[in-house]
From Swiss-Prot:
CDD domains with a match to the protein in the record: GrpE (cd00446)
Homology family: Belongs to the GrpE family.
InterPro entries named in the record: GrpE, GrpE_coiled_coil, GrpE_head
Protein name: Protein GrpE
Keyword set, alphabetical order: Chaperone, Cytoplasm, Stress response
């Protein structure tokens, strides 16, 4: 072998090694790129999920922020309703004016409740007792109604959107 052949052989080996090293580096870099792309996709998805959770928490906080205040107003609404249920039929003009004022106050309170998605839970007589919405305080035998039916409403309940503020207090029928 001549020196020229040896040099060519060495150069060929060096080129092969350089090409192999370059291919290995390219493959490693491609793998790193794919790994980083995957991490970016996962991080982006996590950011989206976090944003959605925060939006949901913000919406719930806004929707239910008045829950405590609303619970305190329920008794006011009950008292206004009771006052209107017991108005005298032969009332004087002054009493009639007071009753009209109480009615206007109750109507205004009902508008505020409606505005803030607070609604009454007033089951129909004979409807099936629902432990999610009703609180049974007693059971009464009644031949005209199925067992576990609402027979009397002692106090209306309320909910704000889908959250219960106060269950309706009811009496239910029992088996005879």
């Amino acid at each position: 072998m001549t020196d020229n052949n040896i040099e060519n052989k060495e150069e060929e080996i060096i080129n092969d090694i350089a090409e192999e090293v370059e291919n290995t580096e390219i493959a490693d870099l491609k793998a790193q790129i794919e790994e980083l792309k995957d991490k970016l996709i996962r991080a982006s998805a996590e950011i989206d999920n976090t944003r959605k959770r925060l939006e949901k928490a913000r919406d719930e906080a806004r929707d239910y922020a008045i829950t405590t205040f609303a619970k305190e107003l329920l008794n006011v609404s009950d008292n206004l309703s009771r006052a209107l249920e017991h108005k005298p039929l032969d009332a004087s003009v002054e009493v009639t004016n007071i009753i009209a004022g109480v009615q206007m106050t109750k109507d205004e309170l009902d508008k505020v409740f409606h505005k803030h998605h607070i609604e009454e839970i007033k089951p129909e007589i004979g409807s099936t007792f629902d432990y999610n919405l009703h609180n049974a305080i007693s059971q009464i035998e009644h031949p005209d109604h199925e067992p576990n039916s609402v027979i009397n409403i002692m106090q209306v309940g309320y909910r704000i959107k889908d959250r219960l503020l106060r269950p309706a207090t009811v009496q239910v029928t029992k088996k005879t």
